[in-house]
A protein has these predicted regions:
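Short-chain dehydrogenase/reductase
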Residues: 92-96, 126-138, 142, 156-157, ...
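Conserved beta-loop-beta element that borders a ligand/cofactor-binding pocket
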Residues: 118, 139-160, 166-169, 173, ...
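Conserved glycine-rich Rossmann-like NAD(P)H-binding loop of the short-chain dehydrogenase/reductase
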Residues: 35-42
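SDR active-site strand-loop-helix element
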Residues: 16, 40, 77, 114-119, ...
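Substrate-positioning beta->alpha
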Residues: 133, 162-163, 182-204, 211-214
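N-terminal Rossmann NAD(P)H-binding glycine-rich loop of SDR-like oxidoreductase domains
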Residues: 2-35
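Mid/C-terminal beta-alpha module of Rossmann-like enzyme folds, strongest
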Residues: 2-12, 198-265, 276-299
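NAD(P)H-binding glycine-rich loop region in Rossmannoid oxidoreductase-like domains
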Residues: 45-109, 119-125
Length: 299
């Protein structure tokens, strides 16, 4: 019988990246569920009901130590996907440094659990730089003495999310698309609300500590099928021409050219689609029951 975790003292739950796509929704879910939360971001925001805001820089251990003081459970949602071309070129090093800094600060502050949202790919072939970095971050966080729950998610779909923005702009703006072979990769897209359900569920179930859990939605489809589904909802015809030699790097520049999604953000999104990302291990679904949304609802 798993132990249901409850909050032991006010504001002892930390959400890092609290101003981001996932972080904002996680904050709302936690507070709606009756928890009081400490929200960490690079910029300072005013406190709100049941949310205490703290400002910290993931490259400054001292600020992280202050942010994690008194924290029992920390949600790790930090990444280095956006930024300048120079920052993109160094993203793996930056993500490694962030994770090492956070682990040191969390250890010094006596944090009891870390819950990390990573990416799901079916390993076998060589991972892209982006997905390798996401897995490496999980290993760094788990290398200490704090139990880590790593949730590896397939493509996350929801308003404000990078994958959704790329999908929406491509389908809405272009009558036809020239696409590389990665549009045929199998994915198990998951609604952002369900990702948040899994994050909160992992926190509540103590038996998830120390485990890597794969999460995805109820539908398995290619990214091309996902684009066609969205176009059908808009009642639009979508013509796709596949070009096998179009590399992820060239794809990201093309997306930058035809949509508002910057190449620095498009590149990791495309990289995450190069590999199949389908749930093979159902342990996460068994340990954290979630009512999953079909893509027709999530889009």
């Amino acid at each position: 019988m798993s132990e249901v975790v409850t909050q032991t003292k006010p504001y002892d739950i930390l959400v890092t990246g609290a101003s981001g796509f996932i972080g904002k929704k996680l904050l709302n879910k936690l507070t709606d569920s009756g928890f009081t939360v400490t929200a960490m971001s690079r910029s300072k925001y005013p406190d709100t009901e049941n949310v205490k805001r703290v400002q910290a820089d993931a490259f400054d251990v001292d600020s992280l130590t202050q942010a994690t003081a008194g924290i029992e459970t920390a949600f790790y949602l930090l990444h280095s996907m956006e930024g300048s071309k120079k920052e993109w070129a160094e993203f793996a090093h930056r993500e490694k440094q962030q994770a090492e800094n956070f682990l040191k600060a969390a250890t010094d502050s006596g944090v009891k659990r870390i819950i990390y949202l990573g990416g799901l790919v079916n390993e076998g072939l060589e991972l892209s730089k982006h997905m390798r970095s996401r897995h490496d971050v999980g290993k760094i966080l788990a290398s200490g003495t704090i139990p880590v729950t790593e949730l590896r998610a397939s493509v996350i779909v929801g308003a404000e999310g990078g994958s959704y923005a790329m999908l929406r702009y491509l389908v809405e703006r272009l009558p036809f698309m020239v696409c590389p072979k990665w549009v045929k990769s199998q994915t198990q897209p998951i609604a952002v609300e369900n990702v948040v359900d899994y994050l909160v569920g992992a926190m509540k179930n103590s038996e998830t500590a120390g485990k890597i859990l794969e999460i995805g939605g109820p539908d398995t489809m290619t990214y091309e099928q996902l684009m066609r589904l969205y176009s059908s909802i808009l009642n639009r015809n979508l013509m796709i021409i596949q070009i096998p030699f179009l590399t992820p790097r060239l794809s990201s520049y093309w997306i930058d050219l035809v949509t508002p999604v910057k190449a620095s953000l498009a590149r990791p999104l495309v990289d995450s689609l190069v590999h199949d990302s389908v749930v093979k291990d159902k342990t996460g679904q068994k340990m954290i029951p979630v009512q999953l949304e079909h893509m027709t609802q999530a889009i």
